[in-house]
Amino acid sequence: MKEKRNGEVVGSYKRRLYMDIIQALTQELQVEKWQVEAAVKLIDEGNTIPFISRYRKEATGSLNDEVLRNLHERLLYLRNLEDKKKQVLSSIEEQGKLTEELKKSILEAQTLVVVEDLYRPYRPKRRTRATIAKEKGLEPLANLILLQMTDKSIEEEAESYVSEEKEVKNVKEAIAGASDILAESVADEADYRIRIRNLTVKSGSVVSSAKKENEKSVYEMYYDFEEPISKLAGHRVLALNRGEKEKILTVKINAPEEEILSWLKRQVIRTDNPNTTPILEAVVEDSYKRLIAPAIEREIRNDLTEKAEDGSIKVFGKNLEQLLMQPPIVGKVVLGWDPAFRTGCKLAVVDETGKVLDTTVVYPTAPTTEAKIKAAKETVKKMIEKYHIDLISVGNGTACRESEQVIVDMLKEVPTKVQYVITNEAGASVYSASKLATEEFPNFDVGQRSAASIARRLQDPLAELVKIDPKAIGVGQYQHDMNQKKLGEALNGVVEDCVNKVGVDLNTASASLLEYISGISKAIAKNIVAYREENGRFTDRRELLKVAKLGPKAFEQCAGFMRIQGGKNPLDATSVHPESYEAVEKLFAKQGFTKEQYFGDGPTAIYIKDYKKLAEELGIGEITLHDIIKELGRPGRDPREDMPKPILRSDVLDMKDLKEGMILKGTVRNVIDFGAFVDIGVHQDGLVHISQISDKYIKHPLEVVSVGDVVDVKVISVDLNKKRIGLSMRGIR
């Protein structure tokens, strides 16, 4: 009977916990409770975010992958919070100090910081001045002072605590020890810390100064800097952190100390007793300055950093998504050009399928001679003629602009139309030195591999960029300064979402691409490639079940994202999930034709009057039916086709050719908190400051522009000495 009652109590606690988390997520994400419950259930059942987002829309009310990832992240945090509460309650209860009021406060805490505040007085402590004073038997004296009711002077009261045995040499030491106990007690009071933290955030500021006067650095704007904590922008937080880390800046929090001390004294000193008030005033000041303020400063700075990192990771993720979703340039022979100075520019010719046809090195950049420049041009011209090169993909790293000038001059001497593109080469060197690149190009050196990668990035950016750690792609700000685990998880999520949005060709996709598909691990991705090599091409999606370690659950998660061109079933070339094939067959039958006719020379349109009724007849959800019809309208459509295509160039401008007021077309290369860098075809990217991005007020550049966008910009300033170009998108129609 007792066991049954205990089981009921545990069950009741778990249900309450579950409902608390559901309620919190509903409020935070501003969605319906049933949507959150469905999403949590699907996640707990082992379904991936891309699968839930694409194939379980009825269950979640069409929550997209971004909302689902936020939900998953917050779900993990809230569950971690509940685990922490459980651990804290258990620890305090074991000490016999758990009151109903304290229990209620802990259970109602909304953050880990508040739980830690409440637990602080009960947490096992290292040896402090207060614990040493307690060991010397001075706690009763501390309690006496705190009561503020003694008629005697504290010096008189303290005499009885002087003890050679306990190493309390005199009255002064006794009072000092008692004061240490009280200072720690005040610092441990959760309500005090919460109020002081809130006051500091509300009225405090972040202040920075230079460690050395008149030192030139990129942090000069922070040499005499102060901004309210509540208004400090994320990119400034990260810049201050970096300046401090590089030992150029001193950064601290300026708190409203007078206001805090005045309030804190009112809480601690309840009566004006001349015997105790002076001591308690000193206790409060010591407690705040020695114990509370440094801890609160650390917490606030950690919180500012965490929020700034989260914001930066979000920007990095959006930039990465745009880079990955750039449209492929298909059916073109591409020359990849990895620019460099001393070691020469590495070139690689890649055919329409991505196969490397030839590689070489030319030396047209400094230190060079006219003869070397001429030889480089002749080499490239011969390659263009021999391999019928259509495009040159130039990496945007060191010596890019010098290479660009050579290419432009050379193209004027070529009879056929060849254009070039400046390609983001971030991470190419990381890839070229990787184990994967060594396996792919065992006979190439790192430069040749890098050139091949730069060429392939133009042909299929997604397929090439997945081979690189997303953190190395570098379309963000301060990415090397932040929590690498959190950054890695977020960016891997972005890559996963992009790969699954596009889908992969099951018969050509590399293991690097396959491992990002929903439900597919690195091991299974390698097994798919091994199966393909041993048995030839896949002709049916269900053949995946023959792959080692790929069971029914993994098949359910991955099948809809795998495409088979020219297979047994034309639906295998679409994003229609195999679980819906029967419904599609019924749909075609109702329309009066077969799938073979539809995908062959038969009718090309499907007519539906009542989606709701038809969905019921087919045994699927109405949203799923809409998705199926959309897919059948453009089978196997690549969503990247809707993205802006890269600007192909055959000439280059010089900075000195720019004039204020010129309108130019450019490509957004990077988006950061304070603006966007745009490639306008000169030797330097221009900056569109956030204030120049839109005619209306915007909080962040991403509201208007993304990496890869082709935009019209107006030149508003040119600084040849500092090589800076100011651009504007305002007032351009």
Range-by-range predicted roles:
Residues 32-33, 45-46, 112, 138, ...:
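Short flexible coil/turn linkers enriched for glycine and charged/polar residues
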Residues 91, 105, 116-118, 243-256, ...:
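Structured, non-catalytic alpha/beta "coupling" segments that mediate domain-domain communication
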Residues 3-18:
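Short, Lys/Arg-enriched N-terminal segments with co-localized hydrophobic residues
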Residues 21, 73, 80-97, 107, ...:
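Long, highly charged, low-complexity intrinsically disordered interaction regions
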Residues 55-57, 146, 256, 339, ...:
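Short, ordered loop/turn segments at secondary-structure junctions
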Residues 67-70, 77, 81-91, 95-336, ...:
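Duplex nucleic acid-engaging cores and interfaces of nucleic-acid transaction enzymes
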Residues 198-205, 337-341, 397-399, 423-430, ...:
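A glycine-rich phosphate-binding loop feature that marks nucleotide/adenosyl-phosphate handling sites
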Residues 12, 567-568, 572-733:
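Single-stranded RNA-binding regions, centering on S1/OB-family and related RNA-binding modules
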